[in-house]
């Protein structure tokens, strides 16, 4: 109505219209994300801005390290971050059963949704009820299973670890697609639909596939060199 008032044509896609007339600074890694060749936007990719200054529960961290050091078997980390799923606990239980069968160990980051909170910890399971930053967790893992949020995807990428994504909302299916396309992990899983056999097959692939390990380590080195925070600060200063 406002555009008609001033004799302007209607806009079918406001997001595209606004982006086309602005300078777009993309806060993701060029080594993980990509751009559409059909874009007519003015854009640059500056790298992800990691925050490694989070306060955390030191006791929870020390308990996690004790669990890590208690054996030599592979470690998987699972989290849904700030997302929730009515199938989260069923999926968590399936992961525990798989870890017991194959002698893997599982760390579950319960998060806001308290995923897996009803499970009983044992030598195969550590339930992390208090938050610990990703940069202190992922270097100890052999694989990470997560919801596919941009931040978690980049944190696993920076750590140089294989990942398996269980996308739920928004951009998560995109990151799931990219991780598999780049050879950094198996094709994503739908928590609500995946059978126990499919979960087991993809978890074992995540942990044992040497190609994922090689590709993830290479990508990790490149992401660590990007300097996303410095890049965006430099970009802002150039506009002044």
Give a label for each model feature.
Residues 1-240:
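Catalytic core of nucleotide-sugar-dependent glycosyltransferases
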């Amino acid at each position: 109505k406002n555009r008609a008032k001033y004799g302007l044509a209607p806009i079918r896609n406001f997001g595209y219209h606004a982006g086309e007339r602005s300078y777009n600074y993309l806060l993701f890694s060029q080594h993980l994300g990509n751009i559409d060749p059909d874009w007519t936007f003015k854009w640059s990719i500056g790298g992800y801005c990691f925050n490694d200054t989070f306060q955390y529960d030191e006791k929870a961290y020390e308990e996690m390290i004790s669990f890590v050091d208690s054996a030599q078997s592979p470690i998987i980390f699972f989290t849904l971050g700030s997302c929730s799923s009515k199938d989260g606990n069923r999926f968590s239980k399936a992961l525990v059963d798989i870890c017991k069968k194959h002698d893997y160990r599982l760390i579950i980051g319960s998060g806001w949704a308290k995923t897996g909170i009803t499970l009983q910890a044992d030598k195969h399971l550590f339930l992390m009820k208090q938050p610990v930053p990703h940069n202190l967790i992922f270097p100890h893992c052999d694989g990470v299973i997560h919801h596919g949020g941009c931040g978690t995807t980049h944190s696993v990428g920076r750590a140089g670890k294989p990942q398996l994504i269980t996308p739920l909302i928004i951009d998560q299916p995109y990151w799931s697609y990219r991780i598999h396309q780049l050879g950094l992990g198996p094709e994503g899983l739908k928590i609500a639909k995946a059978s126990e056999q499919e979960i087991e097959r993809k978890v074992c692939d995540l942990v044992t596939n040497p190609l994922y390990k090689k590709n993830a380590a290479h990508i990790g080195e490149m992401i660590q060199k990007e300097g996303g925070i410095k890049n965006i600060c430099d970009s802002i200063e150039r506009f002044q």
